[in-house]
């Protein structure tokens, strides 16, 4: 009897081992299938996001075509809604004096002041203060908003007075929204981001702002109001006369550039003194069949507040990069269990992943992707990840970041090509910056001086393309070989 029991126990143990081995093999095969599916999703996403040089040229050329069509007539239908900015002349670098600036952003505004020393002299006495806008003012009238800003400006000026001030000091003003103008000294906000009050759209902002300043006894007057990208171009031109464009790559995106006045039929006022003007391209709205749009981009666009609009912006701006990554990771989690058998709840929350967190994962070059693991835990509550899973997340971030960077480069290349400056002319492109001070200074200089006009920038319509490799937007040697430069005033 004992012998039979031993035999049965042995057979049972053997069967258990066999079953365990079978289950283990099945589990391994399942994991292998899931991993292959993960890789399949990753490879397809990489292919759909690919930006080979010929495609970048197609994007650049399409942008140039839309720019030309938009400038030809205000009634021409294009994906761009370019706006003439009546800033003329731009700073020359010779401006001197003490100036104030204000940058009206989405949820806050920045006040700053500084003394400009002219050529070869550093900026001095720089002071700045960032002030949050109370939530109740987001839906208030423009009068209430400007009253609040005027009071804060009054406090700032009392702390940092212009001791050599005239009766009224000049104030440069930048707003983070498109501004349609007939003169630089006034502007109409087309859409003011983050604000819901209808009264701020279509209002003459400068006159409202100056009225608030006067009512509160603040000895400042707004002499120029432009959008933030045009302001950045003004800042770049102060440092380098070869600055021909400025690009904003933040939560939103835009590009502004210097265009000969005779190329823009939308100019409704007197011709500028220096024969050129600043154009705000509003390139966030640019769209083309050549853009590498994936199923994730299509779904994001369909679920956005403005479906079918701002397609270029949704590929390159900080508002959307993290969300694109989240959507790819969600598909992997749902179909391949890359983060385990249960899909993390936070991974299903739209816009849970911010672009700064996505950028941190993109920049994680450690062997075990430690930062990626930390961000997955912090953002999505994923407490345990394998090295392979973290590597996949890193690759998704890389793909999205690279596509955005290369498309941005293609856009910049398109502007330089539109100006006919690719081959032989030095071109400086300013990225970000704080242009309000320089804007105020340039308008002051315009009143005091009549500078000698500069030659108009070249604007030949020769569409002959240089060698593709030499003009590669990601080629580090290109800027030096052809004299093109990208700089950031770094004043924020």
Language model features with spans:
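ATP-binding/phosphotransfer module of carbohydrate and carboxylate kinases, centering on a glycine-rich
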Residues: 1-169, 214, 239, 298-452, ...
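Generic beta-strand structural signal
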Residues: 169-171, 243-245, 253
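Asp/Glu-rich intrinsically disordered low-complexity tracts
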Residues: 449-492
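Conserved beta-strand elements of beta-rich interaction domains across eukaryotes
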Residues: 105-109, 116-119, 136, 176-180, ...
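Glycine-rich phosphate-binding loop and adjoining helix at the ATP-binding site
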Residues: 130-150, 154, 174-237, 242-245, ...
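Acidic active-site catalytic centers that drive phospho-/nucleotidyl reactions
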Residues: 103-105, 228, 454, 463
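Condensing-enzyme catalytic core mediating Claisen C-C bond formation in acyl metabolism
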Residues: 292-295
